[in-house]
Structures are given as C-alpha cells and as structure tokens.
Amino acid sequence: MKSVQFCFLFCCWRAICCRSCELTNITITVEKEECSFCISINTTWCAGYCYTRDLVYKDPARPNIQKACTFKELVYETVKVPGCARHADSLYTYPVATECHCGKCDRDSTDCTVRGLGPSYCSFSDIRE
C-alpha cells in the first residue's frame, strides 16, 4: 500500500514541479529577400517535455510515434519589415502559438529536425531589434 501511495505522490510532484509542454516567450529573427536586414520579434511558442519512449524491439506492425511539444492552436500576426525596396511587399506574417500539447510533430507546418537553423538565424549581417 505504501508503494502505491508513494507512486501517486511522486506522479503528483512530477506533474506540478517539472516543466511540461507549455507556452513560452521566444524571440525570432525575421528577414525578407527584398530587404537589406533582419528584425527581431517577440512571440510565443511551445516548449517543454513530453513523456515518450523508444522501444528496444521495433515492431513494424506498430509504428513508434515520438511525441513532441507542439502547438495545438495558432494565430497569425503581421509586421512591417523596414528598409524594403519601394515595389517590394514589406509585410511578414508569422505564427503565434496560443495553446500547446504533446503530439506528433507535423512536418507540413513545423521544423521537426533535431538541428534546424534556429530562431535567430539571419542571412544578412544587419539585425535590428
């Protein structure tokens, strides 16, 4: 009985104290080819840990889906990138996460790689806040 109580208390402690998948503030760098520099924007995205496991014995009949902390709902915001050529479209639309969950990474809308370019990558040498 004590081991059941301990397991229950441990799970409660872990749920409260350990960071799970949640919204977090990040800064991303935005650039457009027609403009001569990048700007940094503050937004929200999902970060944290999701329970997952990798089976030792792989079963081809049962796919092994690793869960990742990803967005459940998004809204889009638009900023004007300064310094663009007169004929160029200076508006940049970016996603803002409003709700997160642990789920399969959607490769159509998310960079699911282990090592992407990162949110602060800029092709130009000039970055403005």
Swiss-Prot record:
GO BP term, example: G protein-coupled receptor signaling pathway
Gene Ontology MF annotations: follicle-stimulating hormone activity
UniProt cross-references to SMART domains, sorted A to Z: GHB
Keywords: Disulfide bond, Glycoprotein, Hormone, Secreted, Signal
Residues bearing glycans: N25, N42
InterPro entries: Cystine-knot_cytokine, Glyco_hormone_CN, Gonadotropin_bsu, Gonadotropin_bsu_CS
CDD domains: GHB_like (cd00069)
Superkingdom classification of source: Eukaryota
Cellular component per GO, a single term: cytoplasm
Disulfide pairings: C21-C69, C35-C84, C38-C122, C46-C100, C50-C102, C105-C112
Main subcellular localisation: secreted
Signal peptide segment: 1-18
Record carries keyword Cell membrane: no
Pfam families given in the database record: Cys_knot
Function: Together with the alpha chain CGA constitutes follitropin, the follicle-stimulating hormone, and provides its biological specificity to the hormone heterodimer. Binds FSHR, a G protein-coupled receptor, on target cells to activate downstream signaling pathways. Follitropin is involved in follicle development and spermatogenesis in reproductive organs.
Protein family (similarity comment): Belongs to the glycoprotein hormones subunit beta family.
Subunit structure: Heterodimer. The active follitropin is a heterodimer composed of an alpha chain/CGA shared with other hormones and a unique beta chain/FSHB shown here.
Protein name: Follitropin subunit beta
Organism field: Capra hircus (Goat)
Organismal lineage: Eukaryota, Metazoa, Chordata, Craniata, Vertebrata
